[in-house]
Curated annotation (Swiss-Prot):
GO terms for biological process: beta-glucan biosynthetic process. It comes from Shewanella oneidensis (strain ATCC 700550 / JCM 31522 / CIP 106686 / LMG 19005 / NCIMB 14063 / MR-1). Pathway: Glycan metabolism; osmoregulated periplasmic glucan (OPG) biosynthesis. Residues 1-33 form the signal peptide. This is Glucans biosynthesis protein G 1. One of its GO terms (molecular function) is catalytic activity. The lineage of its organism: Bacteria, Pseudomonadati, Pseudomonadota, Gammaproteobacteria, Alteromonadales. The keyword Transit peptide does not apply. InterPro entries: Gal_mutarotase_sf_dom, GH-type_carb-bd, Glucan_biosyn_MdoG/MdoD, Glucan_biosyn_MdoG_C, Ig-like_fold, Ig_E-set, MdoG_OpgG. SUPFAM superfamilies: E set domains, Galactose mutarotase-like.
Length: 544
């Protein structure tokens, strides 16, 4: 059985930092979005190549990590190990006061000039653009370009950026560094370099599969998520981006992570496609024992759907970046847990041993379900995490935070190891991320396609709840009708009905729940066939 943690109620102040960072990062993918333009063999204006190493200047920002010099696969690991051997230092880098006070509209008015994109003049399959510092993004992030085992520090160049009419102040000439970067690739159309991936804000990053629009995000590491004393947000302080090959569909990014509790070295091997794959290799060097740590964390948004529209006044039927948490556990079960926007913060932990995969999924791909011409939620990518090797005992943790606005990311998932990671140790782990419409391979299986609920009596108000769960069959529907088994941790289940659903090439399960005096009930539904068949198990947490 699935082991679940009882939810705890926390003061709103404990999650404000999380919401602010998530909202800020949500802006980063669009704040600098320029119109995609075809690749040109001969740009109309002079091309700016990656800068060479320059002599130190009084106006140059101190380079701490990405110093020009030799670089190999162990360079970042050595830096992280050395960093963790010393007490954590809060880095403060000078920045004109006006940049810190920029409004959202002013900040998005600072745009990277596509003509200055790194590698634009070299005919490579990838290009790179940097983000300016300012607004919420005030940390200086160091960046280096790696070629032939040689790292070259990428100094700030004001000529890389243009300022529109909204921002009134001039851009600085001093080397103030960058706040992050994004990678472009001919993901959707030959000759057009679209955004593929963004690194900006703490340890946040996100990517796209073919045809996707930015939605959920990932992080390098989660620490103390939903902790009453507040969450700790590690930061990627520096990046080393390897120059891609002409004939390769691969770009490699190295990153140095730091926080009061831990330092770490990360390697991201990125392969764009229908489902963009990112192989992540990480080594953590804890300064303190990590007892509240989350590996491979994802952050998303769920406002409402047919699964729950309480107190909703919205013309759109559904509003979410993800609609469910999918898990393939070590026992071979496939579990589907619809997301919710609860009235109180909820934390669920799904115990496992050697997980095979988990991720926040956007399963509903129909525009009619969202009716939002601008947000295009049907294009938001799913994110599937496949552990490499045996991750041992632990739990997939799901955090659902109440929100009244879609600008706030309120969903977090990650893997929490059962045993704390000791201080002074070296902890290595690896996993594959798949970003796209369908990152999980289809099989001849039965999957949950829709969850809806409402009051059980349409004639009058009642506390009794009706649940409707639709299943879709990938393949030919068998003649037999499966048996339905519904369990609950409290209340009374009644009127369980299973029927064929020709419109969905599958089945519809309906049942009623009488909560009685409970304010939180765990639900579990299974379909049983006479012959072996992979069927998703439906899980749900009902709350008042």
């Amino acid at each position: 059985m699935v082991s679940l943690l009882r939810c705890q109620s926390f003061k709103p102040s404990s999650i404000i930092c999380s919401l602010a960072l998530s909202a800020a990062f949500a802006l980063s993918g669009t704040a600098f979005a320029d119109e995609s333009k075809p690749a040109e063999n001969k740009p109309a204006t002079p091309v700016v190549s990656p800068p060479k190493a320059t002599a130190p200047s009084a106006n140059k920002t101190q380079v701490r990590f990405t110093k020009t010099g030799t670089f190999d696969g162990d360079s970042v690991v050595k830096l992280a190990r050395k960093l963790a051997s010393k007490p954590y230092v809060v880095l403060k880098d000078p920045m004109p006061a006006g940049l810190a006070k920029l409004t959202y509209d002013e900040y998005r008015d600072i745009r990277f000039n596509p003509v200055s994109s790194i590698w634009r003049d070299q005919g490579l399959p990838f290009q790179m653009q940097m983000f300016h510092r300012g607004f919420y993004f005030q940390d200086l992030i160091e960046i280096a370009i790696v070629e032939a085992n040689q790292a070259t520090h990428l100094a700030y160049e004001p000529k890389y950026f243009t300022a529109g009419e909204v921002i009134t102040q001039a851009l600085p000439n001093d080397d103030i560094g960058y706040s992050g970067f994004r990678i472009h690739n001919q993901l959707n159309t030959n000759g057009v370099f679209d955004e593929l991936m963004v690194f900006q804000g703490a340890s946040y990053f996100r990517a796209l599969g073919k045809g996707n629009a930015y939605g959920l995000s990932a992080r390098g590491l989660a620490l103390k998520t939903a902790d009453p004393e507040g969450e700790e947000f590690p930061i990627f302080r520096a990046f080393w981006v390897e120059r891609p090959s002409y004939d390769s569909n691969l770009i490699v990014v190295h990153a140095l992570l730091d926080s009061p509790s831990v330092a770490g070295a990360y390697r991201f091997s990125v392969r764009p496609g229908d489902n963009t794959q990112i192989d992540v290799e990480a080594t953590l060097f804890p300064r303190v024992e990590l007892s509240k740590v989350g590996l491979a964390p994802s952050t998303s948004m769920f406002l409402h759907s047919l699964n729950g529209r309480h107190d909703t006044d919205d013309f759109r039927p559904e509003v979410h970046d993800s609609d469910g948490l999918l898990m393939f556990n070590g026992r071979g079960e496939h579990l589907w847990r619809p997301l919710a926007n609860p009235r109180q913060l909820q934390v669920s932990a799904f115990s496992d041993n050697s997980p095979q995969g988990f991720g926040l999924i956007q399963r509903e791909r129909n525009y009619a379900s969202y009716q939002d011409l601008e947000a295009q939620y049907e294009r938001r990518p799913s994110l599937w995490i496949e552990p490499v090797g045996n991750w041992g005992q632990g739990a997939v943790v799901l955090t659902e935070i109440p929100t009244e606005s879609e600008i706030h990311d309120n969903i977090v998932s990650f893997w929490k190891p059962r045993q704390p990671i000791p201080a002074g140790s070296e902890y290595h782990f690896a996993y594959r991320m798949s970003w796209g419409d369908e990152p999980v391979a289809k099989t001849n299986s039965v999957v949950v396609s829709r969850t809806a609920s409402g009051r059980a009596d349409i004639a009058k108000a009642t506390p009794r709840r009706l649940f409707v769960v639709d299943y879709h069959l990938n393949g030919t529907m068998p003649d037999e009708l499966p048996l339905a088994k519904v369990e609950s941790s409290g209340g009374v289940i009644s009127n369980v009905v299973i029927a064929r659903n020709a419109a969905n090439n599958g089945y519809r399960l309906a049942f009623e729940l009488e909560p009685e005096d409970k304010d939180l009930i765990e639900l579990r539904a299974e379909l049983k066939f006479s012959t072996p068949r992979q069927v998703e198990t439906w899980l749900y947490r009902w709350t008042l």
